[in-house]
Amino acid sequence: MSWSTFMHNERPHVHRHAPEFSFSKISFDDRDLPRKLKDTKQRPKAYYAYDVTSQCVVGFAYNRNKNVDLVVDCFRDMFRLMERNGWNCPAQVEVENHLMSQWKDSFLKAGTLFPFVRFCAPLNSQEKFAEPLNGAKKRSVEHKNHLGIGRFYAKNEKYRAESKKISDEYNDTYEEKQYYTWEQLIQEDMNDVHEFNHSLHPNQKKYPGMTRWQVLESNMNPTLQPVDKAILYRFIGEHVETSIKRNSYCRVNYTDLWLSSPEVLDRLAPNNNQVDAYYLPDEDGNMGDVYIYQNGVLLDKLSNVGTFNTAEAEQTEADKLIMTNQNKLISQFDAMTKKEAIAPVVVMKAETAQKIAKATAKPVQVETEEPDMNTLIAQFSDYKGRGVADT
């Protein structure tokens, strides 16, 4: 008997129950979609993020390979959902070691972004809550909606799928009855996720008549904190190398974004205006909030002040507001340069210089007064009395 078989079948295991509130714990896991592609005869890889309380899929992503991009896209999808709904940051995430360990000392370090982070032990699939939820989605939705879902060794006939064996030199090649395009498989799985989320929660005794999504929305943990976007975007956002131009703005993806204040310039390294910009694009590719770093240190959150119409005859109230905001930032820069300007050099009169040269330094006598012992004793007694009174 292998160690894995012994651990899953014979070794005692802990008994747990789900939390009371949504977003108290999010569990991540990957899986292969059950049907194969026409072009590669391989199964697409999917990555899901489940809320443990509601069992909702709150983030998902797809790739042809199980790689880091798959994980990053799943995190991005989850945080986009949170942004759209105004939800705060999950209290805990439960992740695997294989693809997540590279972030153990960065944003997946407990207390950095998430208060609690659990890395599940390798080869211990029963530890992750996402594992049985993958099965629940497959049994309740996928088997109902699609043909060819199952495994050839399944005990239950309705969960069994058959393949045609091909006689070749490998003697281990099987052909599916039907293959599918990438677009079809991904769209159908996204539809399955939506159906799974909006089906009744399995614990109808506790949540009568409520769907998984309704449980998610109505039971959000009240102690959750807002997402620290500056940290999040640095690790899973898009990265653009740029520079601060004219002491006022950075150009990111052909868009000029202004510094929040000219005082940000004081935080730059000497003679270095090169910075790194990070942002998380939405579903339409829009940038949203953009943060700039230099040498790993957060400098500022940029803002899109916009441009105004140069023709006064065509200016709207929005144009005037943009012009006012730009002029405010320019005025702040002018005030800062005036405040930090070096005083102008003046020419000293010749006779004043001669007087200074002829002047002789004289020692200054400082009179010291010997302390009166009676006064010191009285002061000490008064200090001690006040200390006793304070207690």
Regions found by a protein language model. Give the residues of each.
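Active-site beta-loop-alpha junctions of metal-dependent nucleic acid enzymes
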Residues: F60-G86
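Extended, compositionally biased alpha-helical segments that mediate assembly or anchoring
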Residues: L299-T391
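C-terminal, beta-rich DNA-binding module of retroviral/retroelements integrases
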Residues: Y180-E340
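Globin-like tetrapyrrole-binding proteins
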Residues: W87-A91, V95-P226
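Intrinsically disordered terminal and processing segments
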Residues: M1-S22, A110-F116, P122, E131, ...
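Short, flexible loop/turn elements at secondary-structure junctions
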Residues: D29-P34, Y50-S54, R64-K66, N97-L99, ...
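Mobile-element integrase/transposase regions
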Residues: M1-Y48, C56, L70-C74
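Residue-level signal for well-ordered, solvent-exposed loop/turn and beta-edge residues enriched
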Residues: Q55-C56, V297
